[in-house]
Amino acid sequence: MAKLTTRPDPNPKVPKLKAPPGACDSHIHLFGPVSKYPFAADSPYHAHEASPEMFIALQNTLGLSTGVIVSPGGYGRDYTMLADVLAQYPKRFRGIALVRPDIPDSELARLTRLGVRGMRMMSHKRGQHVPNYDPAIAARVHEHGWHIQFYPHGTDIVEYADKLLALPNPIVLDHFASIPSTGGTEQPAVKAVLKMLDTGQVWLKLSGPMRCTSEPPPYPSLTPLARLFAKHAPERMVWGSDWPHVNLEGMVMPNDGDLLDLMLEWVPDEAARNRILVQNPNALYGF
């Protein structure tokens, strides 16, 4: 039976960080209502409703302007909700879809018009209910200008680096490339990501710190890693909250105001921080 994940903190703090105009949250998920958007039969989790209106209210508190909806694994390859929200809010949102390998080109074109800019794939270690590495569909979505958003597992970006770079698409690595923060900045997975960033083909999301450590907020072991990546290639970074933070059972639920304020610690330079929050997502997602 699928587990019901915990809710996000209902009382987000007003952050100390004053976000620049046009600031983007580059990684969120939306859910429900379940009567209209049911979870996939093989989804390992169910989530409470997290509507676009709820997220817009959060953005107003945080001072953010736009967002990138990543179609969640809980919906499998059904992107109906994503498409509906993009049609409803064409200026505020862009999307990342999970699609089937036999999706018609006409449907890819429709999704592109709606604002989908990439396809999410994951390490095979994350299961088969979501798309894994697939060069054939990557080549097809590249024809529509899409990038590949890839979520590694643990340190296996080392195994996937060359495969990803062989694709024609730009590559966006989720959640610090899933690298365990306890391994420090000299571990092979970190060096692999730095080399990938140097190619100019790869972007990295400063998002989901709770996916890289079992520590409670503010995730201090991740700070050296975040600073290293942001200093090495600020022009290749985007930031995301990962709201509504599903699958954190047994962990401390972060406050979204505090999550945004981590950028003050991770990227002390204001010009670089503003680039990560505004110019980079504008270029990557076409706002």
Task: Give residue spans per PLM region.
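Active-site environment of divalent metal-dependent phosphoester hydrolases
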Residues: 31-34, 74-77, 102-105, 129, ...
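Catalytic pocket-lining loop regions of alpha/beta-barrel enzymes
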Residues: 3-4, 131-239
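Hydrophobic faces of well-ordered beta-strands that scaffold small-molecule active sites
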Residues: 24-28, 67-70, 94-97, 119-121, ...
